[in-house]
């Protein structure tokens, strides 16, 4: 679609909607019409919600009305449900012996809204007891009676009789409801986002399902000690199939009951806030489980309840259902879902899963993105309804932010396509995300480690991949996430050290060549990704200390074993194992940003990519980063170009003994106690105004800071 950009007042006004995007990227000019269309489509829906519901925020508060609720003042229980294309609706459960005749809902309008209010018992108690089972029974237009779980239910638990999940009415006494004690933490202005990606169920060394309470008491202190300021919680939304890693959601407003109660999760988030850590939800709005009896699929007997009908509503690779983002009630459901997790559980933002699948009608399947802008704006390929939903979601976050004293909620997109303007504010003509995941970086590392000898590592290609991101759109860099930890793949530590991790990680035995190389490169890979790859950083739990095993959830194929569905945090507590060194280095790396503000600073200036020496040098926010990837060559008095003249000192050294290195750099004079200093001279070198000489051992990274500037 192409809209005119002539001289009328309306057209000039429309053009102003995308001025920020065009200023950043003039190559978007030919696609102005499509960008304006996105903005106008957002405005259309926004105005419609304002007219019909009072505001977007009100529209997204449907979780307070829809579903089964308790009125503590009157002791009444009420339910509202959107169920089109049925002739009868009943509430059934333990409370009425599953009788379909005693508690029938009444139609409220012609659009499919049904409602029922249940009076209290003779003892003035709720007619539906807390934590009792219930379902919605319907008679379809064809006369079939079906039973389904409420789409808005707040708790579901596995049946003791079969593998299906059962809906439960979560309505604890006020004295048993967790009360939040701590404010949402706000990051310091220079503190970049440092994300610890975690899954509650695997966050225990024991071969079992971990709990919210275990995570609160055992894992949160570890994350805090490391210096991460954000947690990304996976698999929170209820999913009947544990091995889906939480990505086949069955109940969108219920949190996973495997790990504990809703009150337990509230306590976890509140304790994280006390520690100054924000918590993001890994939200799955790209698709839904195809489960029928305990999911959303075929809820009212049709295949198009909240979803597209027919083949358009199915994801062939994921074997799941796809939402219809042009449907009014689908938007109500999904936007309310976002607000629900912010209001009820105090999540501080979202990582949106599967954004590439949402953005395109082809869902990115068998499509190789080349960077041609036509791939991002072709109306036959792009799902503009999904884009409008994502923009509405960010508009909602902005409105909630105003209500919460301008708290900045964070949004991250999992997108591999490189969609332009994805991470620009709506006010600049963008879709609204704060960050996108730099998904090319982990792929690069695996290819390098798997296919190239150390001598074949290409410094220029490495730097290009780490720095290749859209101007003005922030990225989260990472070496590996949960994807690389899954069975069938290997973590970086396992690619580097393989089976020797089981036999040669003891500090009581000498380094083997494999372990020596693995520990050194593990640190270097993480540091260069952290410092050069983006404006934020992510780590999957356990990888910070080189967790020795892959991740495999219990399933038929492994005999329902939990042996690999765990994280062995006990390894870092064993003083005789080398995992403690990797853990210590990762913590030092996080605190480096906390102290010096690396991530939020301008992109680094890379002054050297020496292929023969395998040396990379760059400056970022006043720090000088030096990497020697050569497997054997150490360099004495290596000349380094630097812009700022002065006296430099080491602030991080991967070869330090405290990080499992060899201590080849004497950072402190043993006799005087003075720190090693590097003095610049005014010789121009590698396009920098000054130079200094530095000893850089093989497979070592050092970070210098100017301690005393010279004019």
UniProtKB/Swiss-Prot annotation:
Species for this entry: Debaryomyces hansenii (strain ATCC 36239 / CBS 767 / BCRC 21394 / JCM 1990 / NBRC 0083 / IGC 2968) (Yeast)
Record GO terms (molecular function): 1,4-alpha-glucan branching enzyme activity; cation binding; hydrolase activity, hydrolyzing O-glycosyl compounds
Keywords: Cytoplasm, Glycogen biosynthesis, Glycosyltransferase, Transferase
Subcellular location as annotated: Cytoplasm
Protein name: 1,4-alpha-glucan-branching enzyme
Residues that hold (1,4-alpha-D-glucosyl)n according to the record: 98, 135
BP terms from Gene Ontology: glycogen biosynthetic process
Main location: cytoplasm
Protein family: Belongs to the glycosyl hydrolase 13 family. GlgB subfamily.
List of catalytic residues: 353 (nucleophile), 414 (proton donor)
InterPro entries: A-amylase/branching_C (IPR006048), Branching_enzy (IPR037439), Glyco_hydro_13_cat_dom (IPR006047), Glyco_hydro_13_N (IPR004193), Glyco_hydro_b (IPR013780), Glycoside_hydrolase_SF (IPR017853), Ig-like_fold (IPR013783), Ig_E-set (IPR014756)
Statement: the UniProt record of this protein carries the keyword Glycosyltransferase: yes
Pfam families named in the record: Alpha-amylase, Alpha-amylase_C, CBM_48
Gene: GLC3
Pathway: Glycan biosynthesis; glycogen biosynthesis
GO cellular component: cytoplasm
